[in-house]
């Protein structure tokens, strides 16, 4: 398996994610994929390669410097739509907060005593319900938004039924019960803790990365 798509990230869980997505056939030629919180575009690159020229990839990143890198990297990719926007629960504007590294960039204002954040700018925001309302089906949405998971999920309730899979990175323990309810009950997904390699149920602890999908005989774990 070629993991060069991930490039800058290189986490073991990311490699597992790519393997699972490919093995389960969750992303195919001609389909639509979304990378929310693209950072340097590792997943965007994998998605674009998987869906081919006939497919479509939406790539959203809030940090201007990182977005500039994405524009350069994917300037010749006609199947990628680049968005310097926050994916959120409303269409409007969100504040951008950042600490000493890109890993702390978020729209929630959350920081730590070791790496506090401050407001560094503003960015336009859009709901996935709005962005994807004209798509007939979405193969997969990857969400890595440094604690704004609930905002993204609440903003995609209208398009959840036509979304086949989610890959979501979880950050705050206090948000996990709500996230778990949305994924399992509201959206009706099967969910899998990638790091622990086990199914997620109502009693499961928060995973770091969670793969969610609509199970059939062809894509069971």
Label every model-predicted segment.
Residues 1-221:
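Phosphate/nucleotide-binding beta-alpha loop and adjacent structural elements of enzyme active sites
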């Amino acid at each position: 398996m070629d993991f060069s798509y991930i490039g800058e990230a290189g986490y073991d869980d990311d490699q597992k994610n790519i393997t699972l997505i490919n093995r389960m056939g969750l992303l195919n030629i001609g389909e639509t994929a979304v990378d929310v919180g693209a950072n340097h575009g590792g997943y965007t690159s994998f998605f674009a390669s998987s869906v081919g020229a006939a497919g479509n990839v939406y790539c959203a990143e809030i940090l201007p410097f990182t977005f500039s890198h994405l524009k350069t990297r994917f300037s010749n990719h006609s199947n990628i739509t680049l968005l310097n926007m926050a994916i959120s629960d409303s269409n409007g504007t969100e504040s951008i907060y950042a600490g000493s590294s890109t890993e702390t960039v978020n729209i929630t204002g959350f920081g730590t005593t070791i790496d506090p954040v401050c407001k560094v700018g503003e960015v336009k925001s859009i709901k996935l319900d709005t962005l994807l309302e004209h798509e007939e089906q979405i193969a997969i949405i990857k969400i890595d938004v440094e604690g704004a998971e609930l905002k993204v999920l609440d903003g995609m309730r209208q398009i959840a039924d036509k979304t086949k899979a989610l890959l979501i990175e979880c950050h705050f323990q206090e948000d996990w019960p709500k996230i778990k309810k949305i994924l399992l009950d509201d959206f009706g997904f099967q969910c899998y803790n990638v790091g622990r390699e086990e199914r997620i149920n109502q009693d499961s602890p928060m995973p770091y990365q969670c793969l969610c999908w609509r199970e059939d005989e062809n894509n069971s774990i």
